[in-house]
Amino acid sequence: MASEERITALKEFLAKDPNDSFSSYALALEYNGLGQTEKAIATLRDLVQRDPKYVAAYQQLGQLYAKMNKTREAKRYYRRGIEAAEETNDMHAKREMEEALEEIEDEW
């Protein structure tokens, strides 16, 4: 299935269940894969507002902002993701985001 078809399918899932965090996250990844970074970011930001414990979304936001050299935003989302990871006991994601945050801070 091509990315555009997956996007259509994910939008259909979300029309039926707007609170489906997994489908929102998958939609953001599809947008990013097509180079539609702003749509990916908007989708992820909506997701973390709706589901503040969806750790992977913070990690993805941090990565996207870091690639765009938007260091302040990347740090903010990594820090929020670390907090969410602690709350959900996702120590693997916590470590990954701590390492990413350290890399950003070392660059500055």
Language-model features: where?
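Alpha-helical linker/edge segments of TPR/alpha-solenoid repeat scaffolds
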Residues: S3, T71-R76, A100-W108
